[in-house]
């Protein structure tokens, strides 16, 4: 084995030289230079400074403006809540541990940080699944009289939390475990060992199949069907031009969210899968650190995409920030063009 396994950790370095120490008790400066840990801390500080205000503002603006409280927006708000969980429950911890060069909060703190990171990522993924299904039902109309309403949105939000907890909670109760990864300053699922005492192998397989592969299959199926339907509707002019434009805008926004999710999380999932399927292989701490920390940037992109691509929300946000007056002066003019209330468009 090219790593050193302890009771609650796995360090990607052989202890033949005797320098390896517990990541819960000693700085890990033998894995990387101190300045590299400082860079991680600076990166986490940036994510906190950007991630907290923009996600909190997304929630606050929606509460302030009744016209934004549409069923589809419930799912988008769920993404903001998940991102805030990641920022407050995970990023603050990782910032502090990176400044110290090791996971100072011990195994319990590792469980907390790993839980929030996994929970936030999974809520985001399953929210995208719900959005994909919503787009499929609204645009493709497999059920002609179905309308995506408030109750459906609430059930969708509940579903995302149930599925996310089904992935993030088991390591806390003995099925797999959370351990420090990469440079040992952040925690995640143990992909590094089989650890039969906690049935680690079965959990990792379960996680990759149920909580990564299946959601992606659903997403790609829904959007594959959606592309064909939109092209066919455009060719036959089955919808009004205004309705088609609104549907396309919302669909485009959600697809970009999916692409951004894949860009952030597929590198991490790919590296984790490689490590799991190549037990004992030789890899350095940076190999997992870069994709793990890059995935954390997902807490920023969803609200940014939403603000950039939804003119109605953008105007409401400016109105809130500017104490009730939109400096651009086109709050109502843009309301029709980019409403995310397209979930309520009646079937043609």
From Swiss-Prot:
Binding positions (Zn(2+)): 201, 279
UniProt xrefs under SUPFAM superfamilies: Family A G protein-coupled receptor-like
Gene Ontology BP, a term: G protein-coupled opsin signaling pathway
UniProt-annotated location(s): Membrane; Cell projection, Cilium, Photoreceptor outer segment
Site (Plays an important role in the conformation switch to the active conformation): 113
Any one GO MF annotation of this record: G protein-coupled photoreceptor activity
Residues with PTM N6-(retinylidene)lysine: 296
Residues with PTM N-acetylmethionine: 1
Function recorded in the entry: Photoreceptor required for image-forming vision at low light intensity. Required for photoreceptor cell viability after birth. Light-induced isomerization of 11-cis to all-trans retinal triggers a conformational change that activates signaling via G-proteins. Subsequent receptor phosphorylation mediates displacement of the bound G-protein alpha subunit by the arrestin SAG and terminates signaling.
The protein's name in its UniProt record: Rhodopsin
Species of origin: Oryctolagus cuniculus (Rabbit)
Chain's gene name: RHO
């Amino acid at each position: 084995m090219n790593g050193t396994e302890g009771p609650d950790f796995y360090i990607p370095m052989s202890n033949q030289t005797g320098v390896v120490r517990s990541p819960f008790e000693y700085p890990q400066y033998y894995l990387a230079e101190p300045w590299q840990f400082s860079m991680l801390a600076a990166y986490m500080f940036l994510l906190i400074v950007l991630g907290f205000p923009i996600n909190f503002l997304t929630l606050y603006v929606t509460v302030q403006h009744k016209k934004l409280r549409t069923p589809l927006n419930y799912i988008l708000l769920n993404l903001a809540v998940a991102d805030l969980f990641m920022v407050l429950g995970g990023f603050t911890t990782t910032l502090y541990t990176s400044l110290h060069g090791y996971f100072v909060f011990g195994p319990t703190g590792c469980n907390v940080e790993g839980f929030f990171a996994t929970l936030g990522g999974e809520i985001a993924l399953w929210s995208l699944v719900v959005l994909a299904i919503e787009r499929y039902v609204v645009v493709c109309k497999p059920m002609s009289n179905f309308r995506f309403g408030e109750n459906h949105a609430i059930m969708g939000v509940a579903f995302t939390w149930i599925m996310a907890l089904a992935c993030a909670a088991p390591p806390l109760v003995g099925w797999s475990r959370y351990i420090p990864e990469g440079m040992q300053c952040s925690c995640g699922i143990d992909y590094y060992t089989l650890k039969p005492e906690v049935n680690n192998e079965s959990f990792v397989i379960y996680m990759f199949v149920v909580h990564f592969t299946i959601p992606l299959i659903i997403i790609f199926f829904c959007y594959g069907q959606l592309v064909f339907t939109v092209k066919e509707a455009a060719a036959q002019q089955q919808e009004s031009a205004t309705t088609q434009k609104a549907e396309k805008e919302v669909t485009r926004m959600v697809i970009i969210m999916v692409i951004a999710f894949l860009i952030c999380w597929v590198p991490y999932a790919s590296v984790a899968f490689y490590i799991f399927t190549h037990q004992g292989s030789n890899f350095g701490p940076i190999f997992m650190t870069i994709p793990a920390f890059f995935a954390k940037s997902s807490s920023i992109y969803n609200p940014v995409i939403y603000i950039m691509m939804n003119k109605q929300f953008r105007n409401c946000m400016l109105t809130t920030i500017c104490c009730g007056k939109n400096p651009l002066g086109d709050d109502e003019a843009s309301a029709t063009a980019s409403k995310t209330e397209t979930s309520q468009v009646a079937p043609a």
